[in-house]
């Protein structure tokens, strides 16, 4: 299945390269004198991007043909990798579990990156090349973050994600508030990096080693486990983000361009989730600090009630992503394998759902010249195709059966009820009753009702390309929801 996804994404990249060349040639965005120089830059940028994806594909194919055999020795299991003729002990099992999360996330990351690049086709050549270069830096840093065994290299790769993210938000800024949002994101992320530095230095002083595989053999006391866990949660929680550190995220979404909003919610936030997951898995922490659940519950309550009075569509979607990230963090910090499965489905569904939501917000804003809920209504009369796309996306957010988002919700409440019955009932009211009600209430005002635009010139409905895009992402979510069991094999 993953091979087909890679094949599809590779052809999309080739098609985008061809489309860019034709666009530059026929629209005359560059002078004839410098055409070869600009085409060379574009060719090198595209080829570099495709080459790195090809190397990733080869790495996956190499792992796919590695036959892993389980042998029972003295009531314990030993793994034998027949391709490399290696004996993998039980300590390496946690690193193999990380690959279960890593590879599907890489495919989702590549898909969202391609969508962002297609969205940038409306920009000029320099902005397109700049955005592709930053995407390549993020891809290299993210790939290093996934598969490195060094604690130091892991930290540098995680911090390298901030530099292109800041420049994307700063260079594509159109207003002064966007520049302020870029600096706010930068300083909040560096605040979280301080806790990561303290945590990694503390681990290095204790273990005298910077390798994840060697650190996993060290025994941490209860105090050390809780201290490391709190530092990791604050360090990665700033970028997840969780309460009370998520103030920068809605501001960044509102002021940023749509391509960065897609990239931020679908890719960059997930790197923080994956970094926290890798540290907890590979260091094999079993935290006993249960007081983190009240903080995450407060974050869910705060974000849900902020959904009620939002009048900006982008900020509404941003706060809905905050609710889901708190939900995702609860699954991770629980340490239960069943809830880890729920977080796996939630990670993929959140990336696709938030991407589709921000694209729909941009489609509405381009047609009505505003994102304010109070000024938009009657979408079902004026743009029937856009109305159907918004309605389908909203139903998926409400947990309509069949999608992978519904699967993640079902798994979460099924297993979380056994751990904390009262807390699960409390969260059920907010995540299934109040949150979706506030979210759907705002979209109801947009989709239905009489509009003042009816007396004026009607806006254009969705184009064929937009229709395929807005229906393709929900189709992918339903396909993953039906075949979700194949994702965890």
Please name every model-derived segment.
Residues 354-357, 426-456:
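Predominantly late transmembrane helices and immediately cytosolic-facing juxtamembrane segments
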Residues 181, 185, 221-293, 414:
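Short helix-boundary/re-entrant hairpin motifs in multi-pass inner-membrane proteins
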Residues 133, 137-220, 307-371:
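Alpha-helical multi-pass transmembrane bundles of energy-transducing inner-membrane proteins
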């Amino acid at each position: 299945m993953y091979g087909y996804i890679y094949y599809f994404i590779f052809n999309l990249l080739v098609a985008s390269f061809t489309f860019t060349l034709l666009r530059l040639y026929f629209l005359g965005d560059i002078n004839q004198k410098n055409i070869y120089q600009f085409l060379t830059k574009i060719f090198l940028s595209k080829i570099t991007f495709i080459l790195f994806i090809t190397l990733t594909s080869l790495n996956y194919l190499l792992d796919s043909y590695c036959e892993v055999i389980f042998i029972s020795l003295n009531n314990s299991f030993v793994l034998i990798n027949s391709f490399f003729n290696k004996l993998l002990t039980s300590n390496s099992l946690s690193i193999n579990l990380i690959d279960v999360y890593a590879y599907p996330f890489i495919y989702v990351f590549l898909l969202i990156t391609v969508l962002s690049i297609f969205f940038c086709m409306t920009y000029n050549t320099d902005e397109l090349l700049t955005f592709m270069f930053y995407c390549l830096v993020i891809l290299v840093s993210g790939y290093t973050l996934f598969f490195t065994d060094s604690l130091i290299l892991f930290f540098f790769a995680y911090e390298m994600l901030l530099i292109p993210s800041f420049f994307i938000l700063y260079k594509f800024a159109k207003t002064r508030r966007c520049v302020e949002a870029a600096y706010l994101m930068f300083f909040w992320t560096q605040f979280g990096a301080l806790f990561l530095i303290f945590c990694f230095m503390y681990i290095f002083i204790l273990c005298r080693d910077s390798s994840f595989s060697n650190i996993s053999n060290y025994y941490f006391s209860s105090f050390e486990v809780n201290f490391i866990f709190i530092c990791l949660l604050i360090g990665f929680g700033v970028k997840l983000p969780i309460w009370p550190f998520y103030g920068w995220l809605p501001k960044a979404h509102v002021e940023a361009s749509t391509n960065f909003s897609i990239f931020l919610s679908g890719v960059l936030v997930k790197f923080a989730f994956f970094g926290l997951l890798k540290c907890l898995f590979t260091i094999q922490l079993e935290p006993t600090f249960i007081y983190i659940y009240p903080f995450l519950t407060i974050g869910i309550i705060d974000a849900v009630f902020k959904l009620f009075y939002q009048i900006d569509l982008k900020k509404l979607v941003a706060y809905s992503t905050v609710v889901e990230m708190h939900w995702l963090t609860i699954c991770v910090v629980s340490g239960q394998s069943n809830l880890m499965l729920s977080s796996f489905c939630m990670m993929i569904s959140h990336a696709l759902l938030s991407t589709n939501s921000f694209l729909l917000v941009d489609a509405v804003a381009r047609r009505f010249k505003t994102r304010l809920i109070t000024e938009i209504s009657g979408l079902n009369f004026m743009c029937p195709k856009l109305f159907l796309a918004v309605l389908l996306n909203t139903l998926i957010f409400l947990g309509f059966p069949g999608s992978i988002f519904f699967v993640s919700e079902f798994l979460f409440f099924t297993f979380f009820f056994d751990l904390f019955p009262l807390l699960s009932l409390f969260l059920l009211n907010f995540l299934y009753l109040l949150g979706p009600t506030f979210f759907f209430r705002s979209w109801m005002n947009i989709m239905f009702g009489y509009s003042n635009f009816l007396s004026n010139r009607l806006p254009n409905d969705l184009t064929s390309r937009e229709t395929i895009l807005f229906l393709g992402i929900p189709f992918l979510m339903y396909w993953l929801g039906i075949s979700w069991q194949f994702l965890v094999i």
